[in-house]
Amino acid sequence: HPIKHAGEAAFLDLISGGRLEFGLGSGAYQREFDRMRPGLLQTDGYKYMQEMLPAVLALWKGDYAHDGEYWNFPTSTSVPKPLQANPRIWVAARSPVTYDYAVANNANIMCWPFTRPHAEAELYKRQLDEAIAKHGGSADPIFALMRHTAVYENQKDRDEAINAITRVLGQFENLYRNLDDVKNGFPKEIPLQELEGREQYEPTMLEQNLMFGSPETVIEKIKIYEHLGVDEFIYYASMGLSHAGQKRSLKLF
């Protein structure tokens, strides 16, 4: 709910000394929607996000009443207010409609090409450029890109990273396909060899497409994204590596 989000986010800004960066996404899995708002299709989640953001921003400024398609509430406000006059806003975007919305609302961009090749990142940059042009060409949002990341210096650590990401991707496909095979919070891993189009999950493709490799290799990959126009890189660490393996990777990065 916009009022709940506004208050909780403002409180975080308060207790963190004004360090809030507020990010919104439309949701990933139908399983989430089935439990949080039964009857809502995941494909319609973006409509709620698009109505929510302007409401949250207005609640941070002062008294505000909302009469929308998905929420209605009388005059309300956020207590407390954020310490920052204008906290940095982020929108997770992968489709033209979301890039257009982010630019129209002065939001920055977070994108994630999954395990797909560099062409997917190029597609997202084109969508961003088209949205900026559509809105007059003066917008200058921060363009952030996320990739699973593992930096290693030997075959053993490389194999650990590949095995870890393979397990996580098998669980991801379970959730993505809404197979409802989740026990105590852990989705069953789908054998990737059973999937169509599984070439994107081949170890060589994973190592090529993701931010995997030696420090020197990773530097070259980051330079490619920098050349594309990526402003900030998001190190995606949640991939099942051991704690020691994750620390090694972070230090090498």
Question: What are the roles of these predicted feature ranges?
Answer:
Residues H5, M49, A121, V218, ...:
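Aromatic/hydrophobic pocket-lining residues that form the small-molecule binding cavity
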Residues F33, W112-H118, Y236-S249:
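Glycine-rich, proline-tolerant flexible connector loops at the mouths of alpha/beta enzymes
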Residues H1-H66, I109-M110, T115-P117, N163-A164, ...:
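Flexible, glycine-rich active-site loops centered on histidine and acidic residues
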